[in-house]
Design a protein with these regions (language model features):
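Signature of the catalytic double-stranded beta-helix
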Residues: 70-87
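Generic structural marker for isolated residues within well-ordered, non-membrane alpha-helices
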Residues: 45, 78, 148
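Intrinsically disordered, low-complexity boundary segments flanking structured domains
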Residues: 22, 33-35, 76-78, 160-163
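Nucleic-acid nuclease catalytic cores
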Residues: 67, 84-108, 112-174
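Charged, glycine-rich intrinsically disordered N-terminal tails and low-complexity linkers that flank
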Residues: 1-72
Length: 174
């Protein structure tokens, strides 16, 4: 049993470029699929180039609107979850590092306590039919499964709950 180390005490004080720079210090949860060769967004080589500072500037503008929408809707996704479950998720705005495997770093959307256990909440949004592939029937896309395993390992929590808002009404949260 362990507590994760804190790499950055408050990520809300970082600029986007500073945050990206800290992310080059290790492998984050969203990097796990690229490492394993199953990321729909980047190859292992792309990830390597990001980590050695060859692609940071180029990556900042790539798909920024979709990323910004996803970030802004995290609070809404959590509010829908709160109404459905009568729980109180909470944010811990730190960047963590695994104490035994220091290359593993992560920051998380939210935590929630359910039945005396601590879970991570990972918020996703998808507003195109193409990006809904993998979510059908209660499934989670494989690249997100790897992200979740990475996050659970860094945080040392009991589990992870993925929330995906795929439309513009509360019934579209899966």
């Amino acid at each position: 049993n362990y507590e994760p180390d804190v790499l950055v005490e408050d990520i809300t004080t970082l600029s986007h470029d500073e945050w990206k720079l800290y992310r080059t210090l290790g492998i984050g949860g969203s990097d796990a699929a690229a490492v394993c060769g199953i990321s729909p967004w980047k190859t292992a080589r792309d990830l390597y180039e990001e980590k050695v500072h060859k692609k940071i500037k180029e990556q900042n503008d790539d798909g920024w609107v979709a990323k910004e929408i996803g970030k802004r809707l995290e609070e809404l996704v959590v509010q829908i979850f709160m109404k459905r479950t009568d729980t109180r998720p909470y944010a811990v705005r730190k960047m963590f590092r695994h104490p035994l495997y220091p290359f593993m770093i992560s920051d998380f959307d939210f935590f929630v306590k359910l039945d005396e256990k601590i879970y991570l909440l990972e918020c996703k949004t998808s507003f195109s039919y193409h990006h809904m592939n993998g979510w059908e029937g209660g499934n989670i896309p494989p690249h997100y499964v790897l992200q979740g395993i990475h996050y659970m390992s860094v945080a040392n929590v009991d589990g992870i709950i993925f929330l995906c808002l795929h439309g513009n009404h509360e019934g579209s949260l899966i």
